[in-house]
Amino acid sequence: MSDLFDEPDDATPLEPEERDGLLQSWVTTRADLNEAEQASIDKGAAWARRRRGRDMLSEDFVRLLHKRMFGEVWAWAGSYRRTGRNIGVGACRIPAEVAQLLDDVRYWVEHDTYDPDETAVRLHHRLVAIHPFPNGNGRHARMMADLLVQQLGRPPFAWGGADLTDIGEKRRRYINALQSADRHDMAPLLTFARSA
């Protein structure tokens, strides 16, 4: 049996119909999938950097960024999930929750509610908590946070300086920091975001 769809214990597995959305026939192992996704993410990041200065706090941009990041690998990239998960809001609530989050972030920016780092980290945390897509939510949310913090005049985050898709100490620190943010303690996630 292939390890293609084996997920870390703290990751959300794909549903069978979502697995069928794999576009790359050469992908047969988890290592292949990671390689294909990273190549697609790199292209999506380059596309996003070229769009600097444009409004990124729109639902269209949220979906388009995900499509640009994962569209060469998954047919459903850029489409909100339609299935339940062990994390995130109910699928029917995703559009409203994303719209509310973006409204909140625009308010925070306009009224200097938080400093730029905290504004971007709060965007990241809530986007992960909503979990709008079948897969790639953490990577997408980190990219959104990086783009926002840069738009607010700060350098992108280091996010622990590691590949957070692999099981390891840095991923555990990231998950623990997200769980602290779930309990309204943003300090560990802020620290992790700037750690190398």
Predicted stretch roles:
Residues 1-196:
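FIC/Doc superfamily catalytic core
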